[in-house]
Amino acid sequence: SVFYGQYLQVMDSGSKEAPIVIGVYGEGDAPRIEACGQGIWYQNYGTPLDSPTHVYHGYVSSAVLLYDAEYIIVEDLEITNDADEIIGEYYSLGDKMNRTGVAVVAKDKGVRHGITLRNLLIHDVNGNVYDKHMNNGGIYITALRPEHEDVTGVARYQDVTVEGCFVYQVSR
């Protein structure tokens, strides 16, 4: 199956005993998610970075987004996010949309556990080549500053596995 102009955003969790598994079932080719610049969400580190020229907040397009989720397995998918059809958007445009194939984000729930990315084919993810601190590229795993850090603690990960993934033709 090809999911053209579609994306997957997971903002819920499985459990250690019963993780959420997203992947192929049955026979045939791997399902392909072609986000085409869709799946837009807002990234905010929560604090300015060390240089005023470094972008620390803005919109990102992700074909697959795991946001504050845990105990998730994403496997055996083909993922693209190139959006060639956006008129006037070219490779070195300074305000080009940031894009990822897969973005994994921890922010407001403390420690996130059990994230597995396995046997993913990620290609043709063409985002902004300048915003080096924004989620931008094939696979991007980020911990952002929580809104209520005094309550949730620092956002971070434990037990993350990325294996057997092949990433090519991405702009960052």
Question: Which sequence ranges carry the predicted segments?
Answer:
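Short active-site-proximal "capping" loops at secondary-structure junctions
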Residues: 2-5, 27-29
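Extracellular beta-strand/beta-solenoid scaffold signature
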Residues: 5-10, 40-65, 88-108, 130-157, ...
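N-terminal targeting/docking segments
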Residues: 10-16, 161
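Right-handed parallel beta-helix/beta-spiral solenoid domain characteristic of secreted/periplasmic
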Residues: 14-95, 124-130
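Right-handed parallel beta-helix
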Residues: 19, 23-28, 70-81, 110-126, ...
